[in-house]
Curated annotation (Swiss-Prot):
The gene is rpoC1. One of its GO terms (cellular component) is DNA-directed RNA polymerase complex. Belongs to the RNA polymerase beta' chain family. RpoC1 subfamily. It catalyses: RNA(n) + a ribonucleoside 5'-triphosphate = RNA(n+1) + diphosphate. The lineage of its organism: Eukaryota, Viridiplantae, Streptophyta, Embryophyta, Tracheophyta. It comes from the Eukaryota. Binds 1 Mg(2+) ion per subunit. GO terms for molecular function: DNA binding; DNA-directed RNA polymerase activity; magnesium ion binding; zinc ion binding. Zn(2+) binds at C69, C71, C87, C90. Its main location: plastid. This is DNA-directed RNA polymerase subunit beta'. It holds the Pfam family RNA_pol_Rpb1_1.
Length: 681
């Protein structure tokens, strides 16, 4: 059983048959070895007790009730004086019934069986390692053809006669017909190989280091050839090079994890603990069983039939043996991944059986729903809404959620400040929502980040840290620039909020997970906090400098005509309105706030002389002279005031309040980055 305090991670991979046997086999106090499931039965229909050596056997998986054996005898668990520790009649140990949650069994397969995940899933690991087409391997696994054994050291009858090539489709129909079971088995063990056993032999004969060396040499040779000019040939070479890279990476992974390639072919099939595939009795005496039990029964039935053909019958044609091996392979495929080879297996009500893959994968699978999707303490969930006034690293938490998440911290603060004598008094103050509670909550939240998560968490930016602030309402406020990392929008999306408790978690959240420290995509390095949608429209309206706004465009001529009519009627206004001059941006924004000018009204703003805007060859549109000798050179977007000696006195640029506001925001941001950089250096 996994100790949650000693194990911090879980790795899924291939294991050896010896490891499977060690997990599932146990030795009883009388020296008897149990663990192999040999019968396809579950419960006896009369006694309603598990069948011996069946899928729910108490000898293999442990007692159903703690300390009670199959005979009904009782022993105190953990009492060393009680002897013996198991029932001598039924062989059931007197242990805790929770052992049935983790005690495994195994099925000894009569023939090797290829693990369908490694064969049929793309990319096929077995096909990559053997460097053979997937169709050819499938035909070999499912006994569609055979081949002469390439690893036999002794000269064989077929090799001496030279009658057959590497692959011969007709062997399937010719050879088995002339051999009985015993003769065919001897002939096959020496002369030919078929089924998953052939795959296992080839995988066992592989040298992974030689595969890496040969693949690298071939990759370099293909790279030296260069482009041939033929597009089809170049693509073929490119696909081959990609395949060699995948093959090298796969071989390195096997070496690094100490996994042998032949472990991808099963000789022992693990049987899940009974509590993970239960049979439940419902009202009316009916039984509900996990689909995996029926799939296990199918495997055991076919495996026992094959065992009988190989051991008891001596006159069975070899063709029947090969056919039964194929049925065992298909039964194990259905158990591991139902429907991967075509039509899935269904029950009497035309319902598809749920295999291991269906139980594990997907949103409702074991990992995402049960292990990763469990409800946890110090967490909440609510709809997100836009918070444009928030900083990039802040989020708005509703008061209702915040007081629940930080309740223990608030209680500690109330007791430390002697505002409550005990926990009960502190909780009553929180229920009554006294003003002092919100003050302490503000103090607690200032130094405590929170984690926001939006499912599905597909990459690192799916969970980010924020500094929480209290907001009114019942929705979480989020800065719009962080939405792309979460793949979120404000059309009803929900996000979960978590409170990191330990000091290590808080440090990790502050140093690695804060939103303003994750501005680039971890996948491609491009900026991920970029304005989109509403922000782009707002920037356009802010800097358009157009009285018509965004409602008029070339696709809406009606409004343009109305605007032109309005412009003709108010021609005198446009003709005689004087554009105001401002010495600095503060005066311009102040005039806008006093409603003396509009957001898009053109104006002249004095510019600094050190920031030149003059084009070298640009000529003025108009020149105005004054009586004192100064004159104004008017250009398209700026104006220059010169003295009598043509010295530049002032420079004005033609802009709007919207442009000024955007420029000031950008300037403040640049100055902030500069200060932060200077502090860092």
């Amino acid at each position: 059983m996994i100790d949650r305090y000693k194990h911090q991670q879980l790795r899924i991979g291939s294991v050896s048959p010896q490891q499977i046997s060690a997990w599932a086999t146990k030795i009883l106090p009388n020296g008897e070895i149990v663990g192999e499931v040999t019968k396809p039965y579950t419960f006896h229909y009369k006694t309603n007790k598990p069948e011996k050596d069946g899928l729910f056997c108490e000898r293999i998986f442990g007692p159903i009730k703690s300390g009670i054996c199959a005979c009904g005898n009782y022993r105190v668990i953990g009492d060393e004086k009680e002897d013996p520790k198991f029932c001598e009649q039924c062989g059931v140990e007197f242990v805790d019934s929770r052992i049935r949650r983790y005690q495994m069994g195994y099925i000894k397969l009569a023939c090797p069986v290829t693990h369908v995940w490694y064969l049929k899933r793309l990319p096929s690991y077995i096909a990559n390692l053997l460097d053979k087409p997937l169709k050819e391997l499938e035909g070999l696994v499912y006994c569609d053809f055979s081949f002469a054994r390439p690893i036999t050291k002794k000269p064989t009858f077929l090799r001496l006669r030279g009658l057959f090539e590497y692959e011969i489709q007709s062997w399937k129909y010719s050879i088995p017909l002339f051999f009985t079971t015993q003769g065919f088995d001897t002939f096959r063990n020496r002369e030919i190989s078929t089924g998953a056993g052939a795959i296992r032999e080839q995988l066992a004969d592989l040298d992974l280091r030689i595969i890496i060396e040969n693949s690298l040499v071939e990759w370099e040779e293909l790279g030296e050839e260069g482009h041939t000019g033929n597009e089809w040939e170049d693509r073929k070479v490119g696909r081959r090079k990609d395949f060699l890279v995948r093959r090298v990476e796969l071989a390195k992974h096997f070496i690094r994890t100490n996994i042998e390639p032949e472990w991808m072919v099963l000789c022992l099939l693990p049987v899940l603990p009974p509590e993970l595939r239960p049979i439940i009795q419902i009202d009316g005496g009916k039984l509900m069983s996990s689909d995996i039990n029926e799939l296990y029964r199918r495997v055991i039935y076919r495996n026992n039939t094959l065992t009988d053909l190989l051991t008891t019958s001596r006159s069975t044609p070899g063709e029947l043996v090969m056919c039964q091996e194929k049925l065992v392979q298909e039964a194990v495929d259905t158990l591991l991944d139902n429907g991967i080879r075509g039509q899935p297996m269904r029950d009497g009500h035309n319902k598809v059986y749920k295999s291991f893959s269906d139980v594990i994968e997907g949103k409702e699978g074991r990992f995402r729903e049960t292990l990763l999707g469990k409800r946890v303490d110090y967490s909440g969930r609510s709809v997100i809404v836009v918070g444009p006034s928030l900083s990039l690293h802040r989020c708005g938490l509703p008061r209702e959620i915040a007081i629940e998440l930080f309740q223990t911290f608030v209680i500690r603060g109330l007791i430390r400040q002697h505002l409550a004598s005990n926990i009960g008094v502190a909780k009553s103050k929180i229920r009554e929502k006294e003003p002092i509670v919100w003050e302490i909550l503000q103090e607690v939240m200032q130094g405590h980040p929170v984690l926001l998560n939006r499912a599905p968490t597909l990459h690192r930016l799916g969970i980010q840290a924020f500094q929480p602030v209290l907001v009114e309402g019942r929705a979480i406020c989020l800065h719009p620039l962080v939405c792309k990392g979460f793949n979120a929008d404000f059309d009803g999306d929900q996000m979960a909020v978590h409170v990191p408790l330990s000091l290590e978690a808080q440090v990790e959240a502050r140093l690695l997970m804060f939103s303003h420290m994750n501005l680039l995509s971890p996948a491609i390095g491009d900026p991920i906090s970029v304005p989109t949608q509403d922000m782009l429209i707002g920037l356009y309206v802010l800097t358009s400098g157009n009285h018509r706004g965004i409602c008029v465009n070339r696709y809406n001529p009606c409004n343009r005509r109305n605007y032109q009519n309005q412009k003709r009627s108010d021609n005198s206004y446009y003709k005689y309105t004087k554009e105001p001059f401002f010495s600095n941006s503060y005066d311009a924004i102040g005039a806008y706030r006093q409603k003396r000018i509009n957001l898009d009204s053109p104006l002249w703003l004095r510019w600094r002389l050190d920031q030149r805007v003059i084009a070298s060859r640009e000529t003025p549109i108009e020149v105005h002279y004054e009586s004192l000798g100064t004159f104004y050179e008017i250009y398209g977007h700026y104006l220059i005031v010169r003295s009598l000696k043509k010295k530049i006195l002032f420079i004005y640029i033609r802009t709007t309040v919207g442009h000024i506001a955007l420029y000031r925001e950008i300037e403040e941001a640049i100055q902030g980055f500069s200060r932060a950089y200077s502090y860092a250096t």
